[in-house]
Amino acid sequence: MLSPLATPAATRDVLEEHGLSTKHALGQNFLVNDAILQKIVELAQLDASDDVLEVGPGIGTLTIALLKCAGRVVSVERDADLPAVLEDTLDPWADRFALISKDALELTEEEVHLALAKCAVSSEGEGRASRAVPHDANSPVGCSPKQDCLSTTMLRRTLSD
């Protein structure tokens, strides 16, 4: 299993532990299927030298899977309630994880580089981007592959029946 949070029960437990629920106004959806995580990681073709920019980490379900495969992960989250959750769920990887608390549409390349610099592990590989469900696939992210911040972009789309 790539992430222990990839079940409905585990996700519900984490949210309840922090007194939270899904905020549909923010377009929140939580990954609860490890097979989907495996497919995302497989398609991203990550290795320990890669840096990953994740937009919308939620409670950290995909983030855990990314951290198991990549060098460093920087996540951008606009929900002010989730940093405390991420601090708990990602504690074992705290030295390789950085969080930027803001809307990804306002993200700058400099902020990503500063966040990566805070991570202990040095990486010389390619950067990858994982874009979470809340963000419209047609909306731009402030730090894009065109800006040489990341060389490869992988979008995660809403997966429904």
Regions found by a protein language model. Give the residues of each.
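Catalytic cores of RNA-modifying enzymes
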Residues: M1-G127, D136, P140, P145-D161
